[in-house]
Amino acid sequence: MLRIGRELLPFDAASHTIGVHNIATLTAQCAKEAGLPVDVPLVSAAALCHDIGKFGCRGADAKRIPYLHYYYTWQWLSGHGMEHIAHISANHSTWDLEFENLPVESLLLIYADFRVRGTREGGRETVRIYSLAEAYAMILS
C-alpha cells in the first residue's frame, strides 16, 4: 500500500515510514539496553503504522491531512483491535501535550518522526534523515 501510495499521493509515505521505523526502533533498542523500560516491538509496530491515517483522508479532508491523519490512524488501528498500537501511533507528533504524561514509546516515535522529513524538489518528495540540529532548524524556521 505504501509503494502504491507513492504513485498516487503527493507524499512518499513508504520512504518516510521506513526512515521513521529505522530511527525509532534503533533508538528504542538503545534505550532498552540502557535500562529503560521500553517495549521495542510496540515502538516498531507504531512506527510502521504512524501515518496510515493519511490514506483515510478523502474529499474535503484531503486538504487537512497534517491535522486529521492522527484521528484516522487511531480509527483504523483501534477498529482492527490494535488499541495499544493506536495509542502510540496517534500521538506521534503532539507538540501540545505534556511530554511527562506520554509513554516512552510515544516519545521515541515523536523523536523519530521529527528527524525524518521530506522536501519537495521538481514535483516529487525527497525524504531524508536529518541531524537533530537540522530538524530543529526546519521546525523553527
Language-model-detected regions and their locations in the chain:
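A positional/architectural concept
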Residues: S15, G19-N22, L26
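Divalent metal-dependent catalytic cores for phosphoryl transfer on phosphate-bearing substrates
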Residues: R6-E7, E33-L140
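Generic N-terminal amphipathic, Lys/Arg-enriched alpha-helix
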Residues: M1-P10
